Amino acid sequence: MVLSDEAHSMGFYGPNGRGVYEAQGCEGDVDFIVGTFSKSVGTVGGFCVSNHPKFEAIRLACRPYIFTASLPPSVVATATASIRKLMTAHEKRERLWSNARTVHSGLREMGFKLGTETAESAIIAVILTDQTQAVMMWQALLENGLYVNMARPPATPAGTFLLRCSLCAEHTPEQVERILA
């Protein structure tokens, strides 16, 4: 069985924004697709979709699924509308890739250690090894109107601190340049 986790790639990868499995052309090889509505879809909740015969068994054994409530109809309607828009948002997808490449290469040129060698996502992780430096940089960015998420142990390996820069297609070229200023 093959499961594809598209939490960070939905809306970003593939001709229709379905994710890495679509970009790699292996739709027929994937048995289960999981993802979240809280990132590119802009709502809450998540999903697991499948036509696999074992899908029902997963539904019966998956503790987070068993002990949760269904999403409200308004959230489902909003997520559905957002996904439909993502499927045809080719220009936005290209703009998002452009923004990610610009910020990634700019941060690398400034000497920051990043989580990947090239832009592979709309989330760019700046890796730091000093907690005080990470907190000070995070606070300075906030004070200057730039919001980034900071991740630290236990969410990261011991001694590793991340400033996670999340980009979107709506960032203008001027805003992208400000990120790098």
Q: What are the roles of these predicted feature ranges?
A:
Residues 76-94, 105-110:
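Amphipathic alpha-helix from the class-I
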Residues 5, 46, 79, 96, ...:
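Residue-level signature of catalytic and energy-coupling elements of molecular machines
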Residues 7-9, 52, 72, 153-155:
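Short, ordered loop/turn segments at secondary-structure junctions
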Residues 1-23:
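Conserved PLP phosphate-binding loop immediately N-terminal to the Schiff-base lysine helix
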Residues 94-103, 108-145, 155-160, 167-169:
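Conserved PLP-binding catalytic core of the aspartate aminotransferase-like
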Residues 16, 22-57:
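Active-site PLP attachment segment
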